[in-house]
């Protein structure tokens, strides 16, 4: 992508010389998770079997960012098939501690943004792949509402769960990027027509903030606990809330089933044996185990998902924002499987 980046940057310079600006992203370099198609540029999904894969056209998000003047600096490393931070090139390192990984699967996007290698990056999330590396690398990740950002031209892992969002170094930047990549796309059948509205004059006086006490227990870090104190010191009225007692973790079987269906050919051909990560919890084993789920299991999981969606809707009838560690308790599963932003 080096030649492409220079060509796009030169094009932005020429427009600038003519006093033409394409907007706030004019000339800003960004990194793109290597799940998104880039015409005639390798998009390997971090996985050995897909090396040398050359897409015929750009993903929708690439087109939108180019139209806004952003410069594609490079593709960022992704955990193989959107899981973990291990790919065919090794493990994506954490810029703050090179002995640690960046978490995944938007590992390279978070690592590169944290290291200042790009102005922002694009990531995806099925279950924690924006929020986890952002927490790990100290970036600000935004996982938008399901369907808000087009996935056209992006590797499909789980049709009912995959989401696309920005990884930046501050909150304001995530809003700016979302305003550009947001919007309906007829080529993504799950796309929704949700306008982006931001009122800088709106006060926070009436903002209702909730938290789940159980997620701030003994295993929670002091930094997480400090958040409650900071929010309270800012004058907000914190409300303790509870989420319905449901077997949330069971929904992960839906993720495994959809992912196994997406890569059934990989499993049946035994090419998943070439993936670098072969642990018990890695994709090759998960794909195979998912084939033992019955039709009855799927019906029951769909019923459970409906109950989780209803529980989340009921929760947000009383609050506007829920704060807490995203990976403690049921919220990582509940919010992803109900399509809520984070």
What are these regions (language model features)?
Residues 143-225:
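A short helix-breaking turn/cap at a secondary-structure junction
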Residues 57-181, 340-342:
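Short glycine/serine-rich loop segments
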Residues 27, 33, 67, 71-75, ...:
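Glycine-rich, small-residue loops and helix-cap segments
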Residues 10-13, 219-242, 263-276, 298-319:
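Acyltransferase
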Residues 25-45, 203-212, 253-309:
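Short helix-loop capping/hinge segments that flank enzyme active sites or metal/cofactor-binding pockets
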Residues 1-52, 81-83, 87, 200:
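Short, well-ordered alpha-helical
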Residues 1-10, 233, 287, 291-292:
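An N-terminal boundary/leader segment
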Residues 31, 50-53, 162-169, 288-291:
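Short, well-ordered beta-strand elements within core beta-sheets of diverse protein domains
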């Amino acid at each position: 992508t080096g030649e492409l980046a220079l060509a796009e940057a030169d094009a932005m310079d020429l427009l600038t010389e003519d006093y033409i600006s394409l907007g706030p992203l004019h000339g800003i370099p960004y990194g793109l998770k290597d799940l998104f198609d880039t015409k005639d540029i390798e998009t390997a999904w971090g996985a050995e079997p897909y090396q040398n894969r050359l897409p015929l056209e750009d993903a929708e998000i690439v087109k939108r960012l180019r139209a806004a003047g952003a410069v594609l600096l490079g593709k960022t490393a992704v955990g193989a098939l959107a899981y973990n931070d291990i790919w065919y090139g090794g493990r994506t390192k954490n810029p703050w501690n090179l002995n640690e990984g960046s978490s995944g699967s938007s590992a390279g996007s978070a690592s590169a943004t944290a290291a200042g290698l790009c102005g922002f990056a694009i990531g995806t999330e099925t279950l924690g792949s924006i929020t986890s590396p952002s927490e790990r690398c100290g970036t600000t990740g935004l996982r938008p509402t399901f369907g808000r950002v087009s996935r056209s031209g992006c590797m499909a892992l789980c049709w009912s769960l995959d989401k696309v969002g920005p990884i930046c170094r501050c909150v304001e930047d995530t809003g700016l990027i979302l305003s550009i990549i947001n919007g309906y796309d007829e080529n993504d059948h799950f796309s929704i027509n949700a306008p982006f509205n931001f009122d800088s004059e709106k006060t926070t006086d009436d903002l209702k903030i909730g938290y789940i006490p159980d997620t701030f227990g003994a295993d929670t870090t002091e930094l997480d606990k400090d958040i409650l104190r900071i929010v309270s010191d800012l004058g907000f009225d914190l409300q303790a809330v509870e989420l319905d007692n449901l077997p949330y973790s069971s929904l992960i079987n839906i993720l495994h089933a959809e992912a196994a269906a997406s890569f059934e050919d990989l499993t049946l051909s035994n090419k998943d044996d070439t993936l670098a990560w072969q642990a018990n919890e890695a994709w090759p084993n998960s794909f195979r185990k998912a084939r033992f789920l019955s039709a009855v299991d799927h019906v029951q999981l769909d019923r459970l998902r409906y109950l989780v969606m209803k529980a989340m809707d009921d929760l947000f009838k009383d609050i506007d924002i829920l704060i807490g560690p995203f990976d403690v308790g049921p919220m990582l599963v509940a919010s992803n499987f109900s399509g809520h932003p984070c």
